[in-house]
Amino acid sequence: MSNNKGQLLQDPFLNTLRREHVPVSIYLVNGIKLQGQIESFDQYVVLLRNTVTQMVYKHAISTIVPGRAVSFATGESEESPAS
């Protein structure tokens, strides 16, 4: 997957979580679970706010789980399934 394709998915998802102040659980590759709200992000890091703001490097993140369902647009047109 090219970096551009990754950004097409990451940016709208993270931006929706940030804009709507959705509580998230972030699981790191070492198994640690962090909780809070996404304050900001860029190509390499996510700022996660709880009682303090933590800078979490994206390469250390395994999974981001929103506290509620969110919908976001990727800007790509989805192909309809063949009948």
Curated annotation (Swiss-Prot):
Gene3D superfamilies: 2.30.30.100. GO terms for biological process: regulation of DNA-templated transcription; regulation of RNA stability; regulation of translation, ncRNA-mediated. One of its GO terms (molecular function) is RNA binding. Residues 11-70 form the Sm domain. Keywords: RNA-binding, Stress response. One of its GO terms (cellular component) is cytosol. Belongs to the Hfq family. NCBIfam families: Hfq, PRK00395.1. Homohexamer. RNA chaperone that binds small regulatory RNA (sRNAs) and mRNAs to facilitate mRNA translational regulation in response to envelope stress, environmental stress and changes in metabolite concentrations. Also binds with high specificity to tRNAs. HAMAP family: Hfq. This is RNA-binding protein Hfq. The gene is hfq.
